Amino acid sequence: MIKVTEKRADEEGHRKIKSRMVADGSKQRSYEGYEKSDGSSPTARTDSIIMTGVVDAHERRHIAIIDVENAFLQSENDQRIRMAIPGKTTELLVRLNPALYRPYIWYTKKGVPMLYVLIEKALYGMLRAALLFYRKLRADLEDMGFEVNPYDPCVANKVIKGNQCTICWHVDDLKISHVDSKVVLCSTTQQWSTLHLIT
């Protein structure tokens, strides 16, 4: 959500625009000692993508590329995070369910309705959303018997039907490869749907 407000012109006549952003990746942590790595997700290394592509070609593997739909919303938020919902969106929520939302609405000095909510799921744009999804995806893959590569935490392998299946990922985009197309198709339909990773 982005709220844009035009400010008055300065002494030289230049207009200034101010924006406040929620869940857009802007500074959500500004306290001393916070490191960017505390909230960032690992992603597949470029050389891993190239090397797995070389192996795929050499072994004549079948490949599937999938995008995990609603990936972040599948991940539980592990911190207490509040989000302010201003103005029109707040009004729409009250219209949707007055009994639920109206008691929690408050107004700014300028009369703008506001609603604070607790975020239970990882929300697109939240600083830690990609990291939370990474942890979930990695745990799900390990539960399926995949071993994560010790040199790249976004590459995982498992021997299926006597041949290696490789999954390489960048956030919610996965490349799955195996010599048997049925294994790749099984990975993208049955197993992924079972884990609710795709809908």
Question: Which residue stretches match the model-derived regions?
Answer:
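Long, low-complexity, charge-biased intrinsically disordered regions
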Residues: 1-199
